[in-house]
């Protein structure tokens, strides 16, 4: 096939040649893949454990005669129950509450994380 370009070389030249000057030996433009069929619908269990228990404690005060606060029902570390904040505030709170009971290596790593986050929050951010 003397005098004609290979398919790959012609494909590369498509973008370089202006639209009005293109000839047929460069080939046709690549047609984007068009999906003809729809994917099968996913089967979702609407009553799994997580979805079934969503919002179960929302009105515990109304039904439970206001004896328990919803934060008392949260399971997790003591320094995180019913509290929200960023990572630096969370680490400082953890150090304040359980720092005296931590292993030396864990406390050292926590102090390193606090110093890094302190520098990070003071050097970068929206109001700098």
Swiss-Prot record:
GO terms for molecular function: structural constituent of ribosome. It comes from the Eukaryota. Pfam families: MRP-L51. Residues 1-31 form a transit peptide. InterPro entries: Ribosomal_mL51 (IPR019373). GO terms for biological process: mitochondrial translation; translation. GO terms for cellular component: mitochondrial inner membrane; mitochondrial large ribosomal subunit; mitochondrial ribosome. Belongs to the mitochondrion-specific ribosomal protein mL51 family. This is Large ribosomal subunit protein mL51. It comes from Bos taurus. The lineage of its organism: Eukaryota, Metazoa, Chordata, Craniata, Vertebrata. The gene is MRPL51.
């Amino acid at each position: 096939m003397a005098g004609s370009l290979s398919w790959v070389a012609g494909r590369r030249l498509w973008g370089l040649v202006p639209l009005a000057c293109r000839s047929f030996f460069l080939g046709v433009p690549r047609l984007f893949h068009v999906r003809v069929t729809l994917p099968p619908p996913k089967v979702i269990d609407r009553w799994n454990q997580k979805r079934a228990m969503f919002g179960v404690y929302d009105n515990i005060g109304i039904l439970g005669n206001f004896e328990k606060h919803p934060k008392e029902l949260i399971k997790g570390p003591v320094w995180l129950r019913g509290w929200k904040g960023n990572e630096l505030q969370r680490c400082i709170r953890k150090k304040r509450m359980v720092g005296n009971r931590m292993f030396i290596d864990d406390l050292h790593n926590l102090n390193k994380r606090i110093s890094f986050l302190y520098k990070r929050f003071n050097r970068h951010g929206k109001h700098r």
